[in-house]
Curated annotation (Swiss-Prot):
Alphabetized UniProt keyword annotations: Aminopeptidase, Cytoplasm, Hydrolase, Metal-binding, Metalloprotease, Protease, Zinc
Compartments reported by the entry: Cytoplasm
Protein name: Probable aminopeptidase 1
Enzyme Commission (EC) number: 3.4.11.-
A cellular-component GO term for this protein: extracellular space
Active-site residues, Swiss-Prot/TrEMBL: 272
Source organism of the structure: Saccharolobus solfataricus (strain ATCC 35092 / DSM 1617 / JCM 11322 / P2) (Sulfolobus solfataricus)
Family classification: Belongs to the peptidase M1 family.
Coarse class of the protein's main subcellular location: cytoplasm
Domain of life: Archaea
Membrane-traversing stretches: none
Disulfide bonding pattern of the chain: none
Length: 784
């Protein structure tokens, strides 16, 4: 590979089209260079000042002849109005923000470049635009020059060495607020009229930066960081160095926002800021280690929230929001190892999943518990210092942590990142002995098995112990009678635990995290047919009067899933009791539990929905934490599509819009299905929300038959729209996953259909969907 030193880029914009002149300074011994280029018109190429031969081959710009120092390319590009990847126009209020999203392989839609994470370079950007527009990029503006034809030129400071996927350009009538109290300057940029809702995010960002600078012992490297609200955004956020982009619901929150909205903003801001060190300062060599970027940022975001907002119990949220989803996805035979080998860059999109984020973060938590917090931190600090402004691999981090801890973790880590899945630990007690045995946990018995190196933690008769289970089974003999046992202390281990005697587990002092883990384990044991329905509902019965907010929300989620699948309310007593327990909660976690429970009960119980819906007349003035539940209750009892649609159109805040989308998706009138899809195709619902809306419709058991029929009859139209919007098939994959709900009543028909529409890029989500259909069909037979 050539050594790329620097890109000098000049772009002249007219509307959404631009002409570019790019100089690339490099060292190369090659007689032929291949750059990445997509949807760009190449006007001319010069090598060291002389015209040189070139041709376009697929996504490659091939340049012939040896280049000693300088490559100059003149080209023309266009910001897309259809897709929301690469460089595109994000529409709002009849206007449009030009913005970019380059991870993983979309910088090539912006400029010809070496679009590879290991090919770092410095970037010097100049942009010519109409006067009155503002331009944002990774670095501060060096100067603004008046130009002819009513235009100005923004010239930006040069970036440090960085990967192409971290480059950013934004052009709009940005409204900004900033915190200049210390370095770096923190600036929040929004479309006009929304910046005041960014004060919470700015305050979080300032405190998180201070926390990370202390934790990593390395200052933030740039003079400023922008937090940018983008009106249409495929991802939740993107860590462009010094110019972080967010969809609105991941950035804006104020005093009127719900607790869940504030938590989301804090977590996403903290996640993206963690990338400024872990991902930007030190970058993966290749996308095989994508998980390291994402899992570490996830892990650190919860650690920083613990520091900033102790009342939110971020450790409980890490289990509830990350580990549980990762365990669920990792229990399918279609899962992949955390470290997945990527040959084709277009496979990368499939890696942005619960395995890379949630499982990775959970494994890091497990290793931190194994080696100790300070040893773990010291290893991370050494790693960042060793590879800053460069590229690294996962093994480099393990070596650094091993050196700091004085014990090797390489073998344990290799087990967890190169093997798919995870184990269930069977705990069998007999006499004065306890036997631990392991087997790979899968929802369907596929015959797959692995033996993992499992760092087991336990308490027997209230005494703490550890065991590295690196074979199928091991036994512990006691000097006294067995009174109680619990395994997976604080739920730090990425495994499930099945007890032969639940009474022994409940006789131990289970804390909030261990209760949450047990409840989630036994739900999955029901799905996997390892326990019967009576045992499962017996576990739920032990928590009818729980005040553990995480357990309350988890059981509510399980009961709601059963309702979505089979249109049966299996847990009304539990939910009614939980309403009583959390109705007057004053703490944030209690309020979160209350809003979760009443939202579920509004969907499942018409009588409850009728009572709650009376608050809809006062909707603008009620507590934001219950607004979504009230809107759902109104939808369930009134089937009033038009009123909800008018509210959706009238709201200018995405947090409010999303609540109404949840309500529209809860309507029980099948005639809304065609109307909602028309709104999607006409982009009267934000393109970024397409997957969420279709998935929500598929969950609704009252209209699911019509939704499934529509998707099956119009699959090509849906496929074309989603592929265009998301720049590829990954958006379609998430819709296909939700189609597993279609298979509840007609499993064979849906599986046959999925096989018929299958193509390479969505093979995995189709297999996932088919597997879930089989799980749900079996569950239907086993429930009362």
């Amino acid at each position: 590979m050539p050594n790329i030193e620097k890109y000098e880029i000049f772009l002249d914009f007219n509307g959404n089209e631009y002409e570019g002149v790019e100089k690339i300074y490099l060292n190369s011994e090659e007689e032929k260079l291949e750059l990445d280029s997509v949807n760009l018109e190449i006007r001319s190429v010069k090598s060291d000042g002389k015209d040189t031969k070139f041709e376009l081959k697929g996504e490659k710009l091939v340049i012939y002849g040896k280049i000693e120092r300088e490559l100059e390319i003149k080209f023309k590009g266009k910001a897309s109005r259809d897709s929301i990847l690469g460089i595109y126009v994000a529409p709002y209020d009849g206007k449009g923000m030009i913005t970019t999203q380059f991870e993983a392989v979309y910088a090539r839609r912006f400029i010809p470049c070496f679009d590879h994470p290991a090919m770092k370079a410095r970037f010097k950007l100049s942009v010519r635009v109409q006067k009155g527009l503002k331009v944002i990029s990774n670095m501060p503006v060096e100067r603004i020059e008046e130009d002819v034809d009513g235009k100005v030129i923004y010239r930006f400071q040069e970036t440090p060495k960085m990967s192409t996927y971290l480059l950013y350009l934004g052009i709009d009538e940005f409204e900004e607020i900033s915190d200049n109290s210390k370095q770096p300057t923190v600036i929040l940029a929004t479309v006009p009229g929304k910046s005041k809702r960014g004060l919470f995010a700015i305050n979080v960002a300032r405190k998180v930066i201070e926390f990370y600078e202390k934790y990593f012992e390395i200052p933030y490297q740039l003079p400023k960081v922008h937090l940018i609200q983008v009106p249409e955004f495929a991802a939740g956020a993107m860590e462009n160095w010094g110019a972080i982009t967010f969809r609105e619901t991941a950035l804006l929150a104020d005093d009127s926002s719900s607790i869940s909205q504030k938590f989301r903003v804090a977590e996403v801001v903290a996640h993206e800021l963690a990338h400024q060190w872990f991902g930007n300062l030190v970058t993966l060599k290749w996308w095989d280690d994508l998980w390291l970027n994402e899992s570490f940022a996830t892990f650190m975001s919860y650690k920083s929230i613990k520091h900033l907002f102790p009342q939110w119990d971020s450790e409980g949220h890490l289990i509830y929001d990350e580990s549980i989803g990762a365990l669920e996805d990792d229990s399918l035979s279609t899962t992949h190892p955390i470290e997945a080998h990527v040959k084709d860059p277009h496979e990368i999109e499939q890696m942005f999943d619960n395995i890379s984020y949630g499982k990775g973060a959970s494994i890091l938590k497990m290793i931190e518990a194994y080696v100790g917090e300070e040893n773990f931190r010291r290893g991370v600090v050494n790693y960042l210092n060793s590879f800053k402004f460069g590229n690294a691999e996962g093994k480099d981090l393990w070596n650094s942590i091993s050196n700091a801890a004085g014990q090797s973790i390489g073998e344990i880590m290799a087990d967890w990142i190169t093997k798919p899945g995870y184990p269930v630990i069977f705990v069998n007690a007999y006499g004065n002995s306890i036997r631990f045995s392991q087997k790979r946990f899968t929802l369907l018995d596929s015959g797959l098995n692995e033996v993992y190196k499992v760092p087991i933690t336990y308490e027997i008769n209230d005494k703490f112990g550890t065991l590295l289970l690196d074979k199928e089974s091991a036994e512990i003999r006691l000097d006294e009678g067995l009174k109680s046992i619990k395994v997976n202390i604080n739920r730090t281990g990425f495994y499930r635990v099945l007890y032969d005697s639940l009474n022994l587990a409940f006789s131990s002092k289970l804390n909030a995290y261990e209760e949450l883990g047990l409840v989630n384990d036994y739900w999955n044991f029901l799905l996997a047919d390892l326990i019967d329905a009576k045992t499962y509902f017996g576990v739920i019965g032990r928590f009818v009067y729980t005040s553990n907010s995480f357990v309350s929300r988890e059981i509510t989620s399980q009961l709601l899933t059963l309702y979505y699948l089979f249109k049966k309310n299996y847990g009304k007593d539990f939910l009614v009791n939980q309403v009583k327990i959390f109705r007057k909660a004053n703490d944030d976690l209690g309020k979160l539990a209350y809003s979760t429970v009443i939202s579920a009960l509004a969907r499942m119980d018409e009588e409850f929905a009728l009572g709650l819906s009376t608050l809809f007349d006062q909707y603008e003035n009620i507590d934001s934490n219950i607004k979504e539940a009230v809107a759902i209750a109104y939808a369930v009892t009134n089937n009033d599509f038009n009123t909800l649609l008018e509210k959706y159109k009238r709201y200018t805040i995405d947090e409010e819009k999303n609540r109404i989308l949840s309500a529209i998706s809860s309507l029980r009138d099948p005639s809304i299905v065609v109307k909602v899809f028309s709104l999607i195709f006409e982009r009267n619902i934000k393109a970024q929300d397409t997957r969420f809306v279709i998935s929500s419709l598929l969950h609704n058991p009252h209209i699911r038959e019509e939704v499934c029929s529509y998707l099956m009859n119009n699959f090509e139209e849906v496929k074309k729209f989603v592929n265009t919007v998301y720049g590829g098939p990954w958006g379609l994959g998430s819709i296909v996953r939700s189609m597993s709900f279609c298979g509840v009543d007609k499993p064979k028909d849906i599986i046959d259909f999925l096989e018929k529409v299958k193509f390479k890029e969505i093979e995995r989500p189709i297999k996932e969907s088919e597997e879930r259909i089989k799980v749900y069909s079996r569950l239907k037979q086993n429930l009362p």
